[in-house]
Amino acid sequence: MQNILVYQTQTYQTLVPANKRKMEYGLEHVYTRLNRIRRNRGYSFEHVLVQKLNGRVWSARRLGGSSANLPDIIAVNNKESIFLSIEAKSGTADSLYVPSDQIQRCFQIRDMFQIYKTAHVILAFKFMQKRRIREEGKTVYAHRKLQEFYKIADRYSKMKDLPVIKCTYDGSTYEIRNSQARKCFLKDYLMPFSVNSIL
């Protein structure tokens, strides 16, 4: 079997022109690099959030997010009996999205900690200072003000069919179901640190 796979690979390399193979490898390399940048951007936001939350009253930890099928962050205030299950998104576009399955897992973890008097699912959005736009088929970046929003998603706790949540640069939120977007109002959560500040 292994010999057959090696033979097929060698045949492909012989039949496909070198410049096409180079182009395919180049595109794969670009996509890999873009995905890595997006992951690093997300990890950076999560890391900064944890740093800002950790203090005399609050304790926070990153859990691993999508790869671990867990929320990005959990934070607790044991003095005031508050628990937060946080899904964090950051990017350079004008809109950021939280998939329904990621919201669901936040509720699953939140519901495990019913000993806390107050428990919220928080959708955290960070719009980077660089705004990505397309001009004449090219991607360019323009400077803009850093924006952060922390939305309470508790209203979806009892729903079986959760929507995708979209947040725009001005803080407006939308529910997306079956490719249809409908504006919704999610209350802002007052975080225990200065919002839109760079740590």
Question: Across the structure, where does each feature detected by a protein language model lie?
Answer:
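Acidic-basic catalytic patches of nuclease active cores, encompassing PD-(D/E)XK
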Residues: Q2-G64
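Short, well-structured alpha-helical interface segments that form or flank functional binding sites
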Residues: S44, V48, A68-P71, D101
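Active-site metal-binding core of divalent-cation-utilizing nuclease and nuclease-like domains
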Residues: G55-K79
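Short, solvent-exposed loop/turn segments that connect beta-strands within catalytic domains
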Residues: N78-I82, I115-T118, R131-G137
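Short acidic, S/G/P-rich loop/turn micro-motifs used as interaction or catalytic elements
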Residues: G91-S95, K130
